[in-house]
A protein has these predicted regions:
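Extracellular, repeat-based ectodomains that mediate carbohydrate processing or recognition
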Residues: 1-203
Length: 203
């Protein structure tokens, strides 16, 4: 195992860059995402990413993932996809989902080129959807988030194929086994891991 010196990931260094996440890609390279304050000159956070070779050499420059720049784009997460690319998710309060906050995503190919447009992850848009997480597996990826419904927060899941098409609908996860309705109280801050065959662990 080779160890390389630490280095600064972000090129833009003014203000604050925080909340990083990283995914190892199929070709051995990796991609890192973070939120950066006022880099888009809008007095809010935006989501940026940088690709690196396996030895940590930057591949191209850093780029903004979010199209909407009103409000804040925060809490980014990234996962590798089985086609060699990656997908980035973030929480967005620009109003693009028609309410206070939603979860937005963007797919990229192995070269870091955006595939299609930013897309809305959550189908239910009333009130707040946030605290996203994402995991990739063979043929697709899965997203989870917290959604404020019926006066408390619950965890929802949505599967996607690698083209960005939904596989089924969003599914309530935080419920007692065999029950049709959500658990009482708040369930938040979920995380997700996937095996290659698409089996999921959600906490």
């Amino acid at each position: 195992m080779s160890l390389y010196p630490e280095s600064t990931v972000n090129t833009f260094t003014a203000n604050q860059q925080s909340s990083p996440d990283t995914a190892l890609l199929a070709d051995g390279s990796y991609v890192t995402v973070w939120q950066s304050y006022d880099q888009d000159a809008n007095n809010t956070y935006g989501v940026y990413y940088q690709r690196f070779s396996a030895s940590g050499v930057p591949l191209g420059g850093e780029f903004r993932a979010n199209t909407a720049t009103d409000g804040g784009q925060t809490n980014p997460h990234v996962a590798a996809t089985s086609d060699g690319g990656f997908v980035i998710l973030w929480d967005d309060d620009s109003g693009v989902d028609g309410s206070s906050q939603g979860v937005i995503g963007q797919r990229f190919n192995v070269n870091g080129i955006a595939q299609g447009a930013n897309f809305l992850v959550n189908t239910t848009t009333a009130s707040t959807q946030f605290q996203n997480a994402v995991a990739g597996y063979t043929g697709g990826f899965a997203t989870v988030w917290a959604s404020y419904i019926n006066s408390d927060y619950d965890i929802y899941l949505q599967r996607w194929d690698n083209t960005g098409a939904k596989v089924g609908g969003e599914t309530l996860i935080s419920k007692t086994t065999g029950a049709a309705t959500e658990q009482a109280g708040n369930q938040q801050s979920s995380d997700i891991a996937a095996s290659a065959n698409g089996d999921l662990v959600i906490v």
